[in-house]
Amino acid sequence: MAPETEAFDVVIIGGGPGGYAAALYGASAGLSVAMIEMEKVGGTCLHRGCIPAKEFLETAAVWRTVASAAEFGVSAEAPTLDFAVSQARKQSVVDLLTKGLTGVLANRSVTVLSGRGRLTAPGQVTVTEGIDAGRCVIAPSIILATGSVPRTLPGLEVDGQLVVTSDEFLDLDHLPSSAAVVGGGAIGCEFASMLSDLGVAVTIVEGLPTILAACDADVVAQISRSFKKRKIAMITSAVVTGHTRGSSGSSTALAIEGRESLEVEMIVVSVGRRPLTDGVVDPAIGVEIDDRGFIVADGRMRTAATGVWAVGDVVAGTPQLAHVAFAEAMVAIKDILGEEPTPVDYLRVPWAIYCHPEVAFAGLTEAQAIEMGYDVVTKKDPFGGNGRARIIGDTEGMVKVVAARGPDGRAGQVLGVHMVGPWVTEQLGAGYLAVNWEALVDEVAGLIQPHPSLSETFGETMIALTGRGLHVG
């Protein structure tokens, strides 16, 4: 006997940032929405990614503050870490946010089903596992938002003790004395920075010629200098071939081609994420999936199958960022509503990396702009001359602006804004607006920044690009 079906306007498979954002946005537009999630609403970002990772980075920031208290005339004992307390605080933050999200979904009348959703026929999703296994929902519009999981490398099989990914790391009950972070991208640098601040001897092992390969070269240089000063070792252009567990079982030797093995207590694998698309869609439906497992979608997030959209980490060729998933979710819902949405401009999305010092950027790097044919003008301003940075005792970093040279030879359209330094992840908003509104340097330079503030460095950089500087020449 076929299962009884329930009808909705939209059915979403996946309850992470892309899925729940689509659910909330669709429900606020008056659509009836069902969302199927196999674990907890909030997905990787809330439970095993953005939120818990930043909680531990905040623990590291508190450590740094206490360690430098004497500089401000405040007497404090040398800091010690009770990691169990840090874990408990992380979990309380996650639980509180999960409860809030669950409440918002309920208030918007979103039907949340627990289990693994599978698109079994056009417009029909069946729950195949979990509490609601066997239930069937139908809708004219289906959104695939099943997310991703950490990738691993051959020879680095995850055991949850000596070899971990972000999933296992964020649930550890203790920190190692030494660690190799395999992968020097955003997540790898965040883990390396946090571990180093908390007293762990860290080595970043990166396969590419540089860490943070997606960042502007001046940003990479600044972070590399900072990490070296903090004794974070970096091995680049590395080929990892495996590891050999020590006889005691408490350490392992990471094998790197052409180099001596690196003995550490833990290997943290941070080499990107793979999409969760296996078994999500019946092949006969016609959703195109590329050879890496990603779903192919157009600018409106439509897949090759009529009535099926995809958002978030599963989408081919897009940044795997929660805020990008939010934006894609809104595009998909607007398209379902027939509102002619503006596609996400992936070259201009904001990026935030929460290592110390922080990194934030939007738009083109200098190298990208030149490669695309622009005649560029750039300007850099260090935080060392910023009064607010001096006050808080955090002066590492700089702001760099990349602009197109106008017909008069002066800096014209703002192409990219790149920041390294204190709280730059909170400062990027003005730079992001400048890039996305295709603002001219003269226009942005006319905006007044409060004094004393960290954001003055962004303002001063823009003023200097006009050809007349204040504190910056």
Regions found by a protein language model. Name each.
Residues 2-8, 24-31, 36-175, 203, ...:
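Glycine-rich flavin
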Residues 218, 222, 311-368, 451-473:
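A conserved FAD-binding loop/helix module that cradles the flavin
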Residues 4-16, 175-185:
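Beta1/beta-strand and adjacent pyrophosphate-binding region of the FAD-binding site
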Residues 159-176, 261-338, 430:
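FAD-site-proximal beta/loop scaffold in flavoenzymes
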Residues 173-215:
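Rossmann-like NAD(P)H-binding beta-loop-alpha module
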Residues 11-13, 117, 136-147, 182, ...:
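Short hydrophobic core segments
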Residues 11-18, 22, 27-39, 44, ...:
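Flexible, glycine-rich terminal cap/loop adjacent to redox cofactors
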Residues 111-114, 118-129, 198-299, 364, ...:
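A Rossmann-like FAD-binding core segment of flavoenzymes
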